[in-house]
Design a protein with these regions (language model features):
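Primary mode marks residue(s) on the alpha4-beta5-alpha5 output face of response regulator receiver
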Residues: 1-169
Length: 169
């Protein structure tokens, strides 16, 4: 279990099975993004997430965070998954925003969801609509090394159902 404070990555609890979790945050006051990764996601995707969260915690602009991540991929410091990488955001206590930049709107607890990382994926590769808004399956960061198929699920980690008011942002 990891967290980031003042630019430092903190190990809150050591694991033994390759699965790891991170309490991510962005520039918004109150943003809370609990996210867990399978072993391949821990080896690859989580390092990108930690880099982004660390830079944001230092007040780095979102454009600069994006450039730093792209540069880290280009230098081989960050690597795309070689096999299925999975992340899941199942906590009903998540506080999400529509975008990590200052223009992002508070969404709150959006939907519990799984993210399957498929580098270079596009909605068309899965027969999905381009924007995916309101759909149970969508593609985030299409066409990039960070592309992910996002699949909404009906229950939170505690077993409670998604409230009818969950927002589709």
């Amino acid at each position: 279990m990891y967290a980031v404070r003042d630019g430092n990555v903190l190990t809150l609890r050591e694991g033994s099975n390759g699965v790891a979790c991170l309490v991510a945050r962005d520039l918004h006051e109150g943003g809370l993004y609990p996210i867990c990764f399978n072993a391949e996601g821990t080896r690859t995707v989580m390092h990108r997430e930690l880099m982004q969260v660390r830079l944001r915690s230092l007040g780095v602009s979102e454009d600069s965070v994006d450039r730093a991540v792209s540069s880290a991929y280009a230098r081989g410091e960050l690597t795309a998954p070689r096999e299925l990488a999975l992340a899941y955001m199942m906590s009903p206590r998540q506080v999400l925003f529509s975008s990590p930049d200052a223009a992002g709107r508070r969404v709150g607890a959006w939907h519990p969801h799984l993210m399957f990382y498929v580098p270079g994926a596009t909605p068309a590769k899965f027969g999905l609509t381009q924007d995916g808004a309101g759909e149970p399956i969508s593609v985030g960061s299409p066409g990039t090394p960070q592309a992910e198929m996002i699949v909404k699920v009906p229950k939170w980690a505690d077993g409670s159902p998604v409230a009818g008011g969950a927002k589709d942002q």
